[in-house]
């Protein structure tokens, strides 16, 4: 019964985090999104200048400086006012953050499903189960060689973060026009791939 309650609570938390992520990406709260966006970019730009270990150490020191200073401030304030409010972070210290065995098993099963799905798809592409799909994958890998030559992984990550916080807003504002152009591109690509597939011996057109 307890495991079921924990699972329900975890699902509610996951749903809540999902809604919060959507609100962040769509800039529903400009101040909150700005803080998160700026913090992530600052951390990524810091990684350009410093190693991961240094950045993590600096972040830990900054967090400790804030919490220790606040703890000392509250202790002095309680001593001056002669009050006993207890530990300032007591509510966070008492918060349950452990995962039950059922929750761990659930997330492990989800990870296993995704891993198996990716492995099967890669096997299908590399062993040329469908020639056209394998050719598409080869073209994608060929394009990525040029992308990798122009940008390093960290630069691509920064571009991905900027896109995550900008593209949803742009799409939400110009959804009709973007859907129209994407439909045209998809139609043209399907037409081209159908012509190519028709000229390749031994391939069958997908229904």
Curated annotation (Swiss-Prot):
Annotated GO CC locations: endoplasmic reticulum membrane; neuron projection; nucleus; postsynaptic density
Top-level taxon: Eukaryota
Protein name: Reticulon-1-A
Membrane-protein topology: Multi-pass membrane protein
Annotated Reticulon domain residues: 21-207
Organism lineage string: Eukaryota, Metazoa, Chordata, Craniata, Vertebrata
Keyword annotations of the record: Endoplasmic reticulum, Membrane, Nucleus, Transmembrane, Transmembrane helix
Pfam families per UniProt: Reticulon
Function (record text): Inhibits amyloid precursor protein processing, probably by blocking BACE1 activity.
Further information: This sequence corresponds to isoform C of rtn1-B.
Organs and tissues of expression: Expressed in the animal hemisphere (presumptive neural ectoderm) of blastula and gastrula stage embryos, and along the anterior neural border, in the panplacodal primordium, and in the dorsolateral side of archenteron roof of late neurula embryos. At the tailbud stage, expression localizes to the central nervous system, including the spinal cord, prosencephalon, mesencephalon and rhombencephalon, as well as the lateral line placode, otic vesicle and pronephros.
UniProt GO BP: brain development; endoplasmic reticulum tubular network formation; neuron differentiation
Keyword match Cell membrane: no
Record field: transmembrane: 35-55, 139-159
